[in-house]
C-alpha cells in the first residue's frame, strides 16, 4: 500500500525535490514583501487618518483627518470641539486604529463617571463592530471579546493583545477603580 508521502516522492512534488535556486528566489521575494509590509505599517502608524480610510474604510472629514493624525503622532492631544461634532465616534475609531496598529497596547478611557467612561466602549461595540474590518480584529477566541464587568467597567480585547478599557476617576481622583490594570 502506497502512502501519501511515497506517492509525493514518486511524483516529484515532495519537499526533497525543490530546486535550491527556487527556494533562494522565494526567500528573497518573501523578504522583499515583508519589508514592504513593515514600511506600510510604519506609514500607517504616523498617518492614522490614512489607515482609518484604507483599512477600516471610514471616510473622515478634513478636520477629523487632522485630529486623527495628531492622535497618531502625539502623546497628548487636547480637543475642544462643539456639540454634535462626533467626538466620541472619532475617538472610538482612533482608539480601535491604535489598538490594531500597536499590538499589545493598553488604551485607557478615564472619565469622571462610569457612564462617561463606558460611552466610548459602547460606541465601539454598538456602532463600529458591525464593520467587518473591525470585527475581524476583535478577540472572541478567549471568550473576552467585549464585556462589562461587575464594577461597571467595560473593555474590548483585540487579537493582537491590545485592549481598550474604561476606568472611573470619580470626584477628586481619589477613587480610581482598577488603576493597577494600567501598568
Task: Enumerate the language-model features and the residues they cover.
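Phosphate/NTP-binding elements of NTP-utilizing enzymes
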Residues: 2-183
Amino acid at each position: 500500500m502506497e502512502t501519501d508521502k511515497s506517492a509525493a516522492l514518486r511524483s516529484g512534488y515532495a519537499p526533497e525535490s525543490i530546486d535550491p535556486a527556487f527556494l533562494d528566489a522565494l526567500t528573497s521575494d518573501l523578504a522583499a514583501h515583508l519589508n514592504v509590509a513593515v514600511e506600510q505599517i510604519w506609514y500607517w502608524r504616523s498617518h492614522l487618518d490614512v489607515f482609518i480610510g484604507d483599512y477600516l474604510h471610514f471616510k473622515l472629514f478634513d478636520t477629523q483627518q487632522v485630529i486623527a493624525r495628531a492622535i497618531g503622532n502625539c502623546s497628548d492631544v487636547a480637543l475642544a470641539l462643539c456639540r454634535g461634532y462626533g467626538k466620541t465616534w472619532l475617538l472610538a475609531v482612533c482608539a480601535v486604529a491604535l489598538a490594531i496598529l500597536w499590538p499589545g497596547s493598553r488604551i485607557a478611557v478615564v472619565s469622571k463617571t462610569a457612564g462617561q467612561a463606558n460611552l466610548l466602549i459602547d460606541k465601539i461595540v454598538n456602532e463600529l463592530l458591525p464593520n467587518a474590518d473591525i470585527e475581524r480584529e476583535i478577540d472572541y477566541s478567549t471568550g473576552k471579546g467585549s464585556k462589562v464587568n461587575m464594577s461597571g467597567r467595560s473593555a474590548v480585547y483585540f487579537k493582537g493583545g491590545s485592549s481598550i478599557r474604561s476606568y472611573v476617576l470619580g470626584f477628586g481622583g481619589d477613587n480610581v477603580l482598577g488603576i493597577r490594570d494600567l501598568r
